[in-house]
């Protein structure tokens, strides 16, 4: 939904969790009058269900990080890297070392555009602390020949 705030004319969200998908639909409905944009929520499992995102320019995602289930993010990342899009933005654990090699396998270049601490509220049963923080990196994947974001623009974000 954040893409609406920066001018996207069409936003397609893919969510596997039925409760999260319902929240996304409600939020789309709430924001409908504020933005002249089309929003779609697809409730599906990437890698299992048939999903058509052929009209998408940019993918923005926060995949499972594979902390509880090793390689849980792999099918989602592979799906994104196989799409014909201009860029892919991924929020992921700063500890992840597999993103760059995987992206390169699919012909993508990568740059980290933001590093920060991310607050993790105890949302799931495996969250044992009342509230925790983890280091994250926001990655931008782009095709070779496509330029990186100029360092001055990244510095302005900090």
Please give the residue ranges for each predicted region:
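Class I S-adenosyl-L-methionine-dependent methyltransferase catalytic core
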Residues: 1-158
């Amino acid at each position: 939904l954040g893409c609406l705030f920066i001018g996207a004319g069409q936003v397609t969200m893919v969510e596997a969790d039925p409760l999260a998908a319902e929240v996304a639909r409600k939020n789309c409905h709430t924001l409908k009058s504020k933005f002249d944009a089309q929003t779609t929520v697809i409730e599906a499992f990437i890698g299992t269900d048939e999903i058509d995102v052929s009209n998408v320019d940019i993918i923005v995602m926060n995949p499972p990080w594979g902390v509880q289930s090793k390689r849980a993010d792999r099918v989602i990342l592979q799906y994104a890297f196989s799409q014909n899009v201009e860029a892919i933005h991924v929020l992921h654990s700063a500890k992840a070392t597999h993103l760059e090699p995987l992206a390169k396998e699919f012909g993508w270049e990568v740059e980290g555009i933001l590093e920060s601490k991310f607050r993790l509220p105890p949302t799931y049963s495996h969250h044992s602390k009342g509230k925790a923080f983890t280091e994250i990196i926001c990655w931008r994947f782009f095709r070779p020949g496509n330029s990186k974001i100029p360092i001055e623009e990244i510095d302005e974000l900090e």
